[in-house]
Design a protein with these regions (language model features):
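Conserved, mostly hydrophobic/aromatic
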Residues: 24, 47, 78, 117, ...
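An alpha-helical appendage that flanks or caps ligand/catalytic pockets
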Residues: 103-145, 190-320
Length: 351
């Protein structure tokens, strides 16, 4: 089982990635959330220049953030810095679009975007739509050595719904999933395997990564400790955000969360301006717990929705994930909580 990290891009994120590489982590995944973080490719380039082994992936690139030729150029430029260590992770958009009041893109738009980016990275001439007109484009002088389209850049799709998983099985080299409750994570990887079989490809040929937040609890430490709240707590409000904005089907809401979601909704309705409440809702998304959200981040929810448990418990979860078909667990490093890297590295050594 590989262990990776996920992180919010910043100009000093390379320090975390360099530290992760020294500790044996296999991958570093960078969020593409332009209204919250620094530019994803700036952060990745700095990390690429200061590391030599760790794989660097966009986790995930959002098509509406940049046109396909620009994305292909950024990936190929990064590949010049870190040949063979770049992964093109992409999806229809969650945080990057919600922070601007937008929902996810259409799968058809994602498919087209991926088609163009991959063709350009192969060195092909490809037709794409630019400003309402179909145009033929290609990299004109890759032989100049300014970019690298020689070393392959694998495609990993983040896919949570059946149609997205079918697309992943059809075109991708890897699948990215966000895991909270272990039984659900195991069910979802089986559904991904079924999609692979339906697409007539062996499930083992698709590299599967589960992303999460969590905390390796020390002896006698509670899930409500300050350390656990800092490392894992930021995921809990995002669950409320998802139900509130209907990113997640409300039918999936556990009955016991009903009162808390109602209270969170009442709080949300106080946000201003009324036509852009998302501006306050998503401030610090997955990076911290805002003061008004603290009361919703209970020890019970931290345990239920994140990978927060003792090392022994987490070891069994990871082994169950590996047995089910996951090849990597990627844990987000919350800003200011980089010391968690040593905890997860110690756990990885025992799995």
């Amino acid at each position: 089982m590989d262990f990776g990290i996920a992180l919010a891009p910043g100009v000093d994120a390379w320090q975390t990635v360099e530290r992760a590489e020294r500790l044996g982590f296999s991958h570093a995944w960078f969020y593409d959330t332009q209204m919250l973080c620094a530019d994803v490719f700036v952060a990745m380039a700095l990390a690429a220049a200061r590391t030599s082994k760790i794989v660097l992936g966009t986790g995930v690139l959002v098509p509406s953030n940049r046109i396909a030729p620009v994305a292909a150029n950024a990936l190929a430029s990064l590949n010049r810095l870190a040949p063979g260590r770049v992964v093109f992770g992409v999806s229809t958009g969650f945080t990057a679009r919600n922070t601007m009041g937008l929902g996810p893109m259409k799968l058809s738009e994602l498919r087209e975007y991926v088609r163009v980016v991959r063709a350009l990275l192969r060195g092909d001439t490809v037709e794409c739509e630019l400003e309402g007109t179909r145009r033929k484009v290609r990299f004109l002088n890759p032989e100049a050595g300014l970019i690298d389209i020689t070393h392959p850049i694998p495609l990993h799709l983040s896919a949570f719904a059946p149609k997205a998983r079918s697309l992943t099985a059809e075109i991708a080299d890897g699948w990215m999933n966000f895991v909270t409750v272990l039984p659900t994570a195991l069910q979802e990887v089986e559904e991904m395997a079924a999609a692979c079989r339906a697409a007539c490809r062996p499930p083992d040929g698709l590299y599967k990564t589960g992303f999460t937040l969590g905390c390796v609890l020390r002896e006698g430490e509670d899930a409500g400790s300050r350390r656990a709240r800092a490392q894992a707590g930021p995921l809990v409000p995002v669950i409320f955000h998802a139900f509130l904005e209907r990113t997640v089907d409300p039918a999936l809401l556990p009955p016991e969360l009903g009162p808390a979601v109602s209270a969170f909704r009442a709080q949300y309705e106080t946000y201003a301006p009324p036509d852009a409440r998302y501006l306050q809702l998503h401030k610090g998304h997955l990076m911290c717990v805002r003061p008004e959200e603290e009361r919703f981040v209970t020890p019970e929810l931290i345990r239920m929705a994140t990978f927060t448990a003792t090392a022994a418990e987490l070891r069994e979860r990871v082994r169950a994930m590996a047995a089910a078909g996951y090849q990597q667990l990627a844990v987000q490093v919350v800003p200011g909580q980089e010391a968690a890297l040593e905890d997860w590295a110690a756990l990885a050594a025992t799995v």
